[in-house]
Each structure stands twice: as C-alpha cells, then as structure tokens.
Curated annotation (Swiss-Prot):
Acyltransferase keyword on record: no
Alphabetized SUPFAM superfamilies for the sequence: Pentein
InterPro entries reported in the protein's UniProt record: eIF6
Organism the protein comes from: Pyrococcus horikoshii (strain ATCC 700860 / DSM 12428 / JCM 9974 / NBRC 100139 / OT-3)
Lineage: Archaea, Methanobacteriati, Methanobacteriota, Thermococci, Thermococcales
Name of the protein this chain belongs to: Translation initiation factor 6
Family statement: Belongs to the eIF-6 family.
GO molecular function ontology, one term from the record: ribosome binding
Amino acid sequence: MHIERLDFENSPYLGVFGVATDRVVLIREGLQEKKLEVIRETLKVPVIEVSVMKSRIIGTLATGNSNAIILPWYVWDAEIERIKKALSEYGIDMEVVPFRSKYTALGNLILTNDKAALVSAKFSRKEAQEIGEILGVEVERGVIAGLHAVGSAGVVTNKGGLVHPETSDEELEWLSDLFKVDVYVGTANMGVPYVGTCMLANSNGVVVGHLTTGPEIVKIEEALGFV
C-alpha cells in the first residue's frame, strides 16, 4: 500500500514526531516495533529513532531531504553522532548539520524536497541562503496562506505536494514552479489544515494520522502522486 493510517500513542499528528526523506526517516524514540515496521514498509526506507535534547518532537525541530538533515543548534553532540552512526550503518551518505539561528522549530519553518526549499520569511536572506546550501537546493523565503509555519502548512515530496486549504491559486502555481511538482490544497485528520503536522511522506508512500477520512485520503493520494 502507498498509504497507511497510524497513530503514535493515540496522537494523529505524525508529522510532529518525524522527518521523512527518500533515503531515511527520522522518528521519535519509544514507538512500538510494529508501528516502526508500518513506516518502513510504507515509505520503503530505513527508520532511525532519534531525539533532540531528549525531545520527541523531531518533526517540529528538524527537517531534511535526500542531501542533508538540519537540526537546531542546541542538539547534543551525542545525538548528532548517533544519527551519523546509524546513517553510516545503513550506507547512507548524508550531511547532518546543526543550524545556528534564533529560530529553532526548523521543521515548522522549512518545507523542502530534493528540488527546492521554502523557508519562512522570518529567516534572514543570509540564513535562507545557508539553508539552501546545506540542503543542496534552490531556496526561497515566503509564507503559505499567510502562515510563516510553511513546514506545518504543507508537505512536499519529489512526486507532489499538499498544502493548507486557504492557499491561493497564485501561491499554488508559485509552489508548483518552485518544487517542480503539482501542488494541491487539502486537509487531514478530519479537517486539520496544517497537513505537514499530520503525516510522514516521501516518494514511495505516506503514513497519515488515524483520524484522516476516506475523502481526505483520496486527495492526499492524488496530491502526492500515488493515483
């Protein structure tokens, strides 16, 4: 299956607790093995359990694509080394970079695939350029539907994108041009507009919160290129 419903200890906000790329998924510590297996089988990449200063909200704090993982600057050295060691054991060559900024909810403020990154306009132009260089992609500063939390308001892979339902047609066109994929509006978890918080997705599949309805799943599958 390209899409599976899941909960993390009854929370439907899967995107808060993980970062999905086409090469690896970083996920919070402490999930049941059967849930890790659903993620592995659906997204078809290795899954690494991680923490950031012992926090479980990995998807809020970190982001990444096939080239690099970006973490907040205060992540412990031991946590960085654990991620690097796990990547090495899987034969995955990726940068793992702590990023110094006063903004540390990087997963909320950065939306990226392997083609481009959209970063919140809260970041300076210099910071945006640095983020683009780390991720190895074109970068733009901006908002989605008036929201700085672009990583929460959207999910984008190398096959498609889904964003906040109040995103304008002009913004959709701009996002499609930037990320080089078709981008649609939609919701998850029974009407939640912050779709980035609700799912973990890559080019192989998507794991979405267990409250997501049938019609929402149809739209998610279409938007992320699985139809």
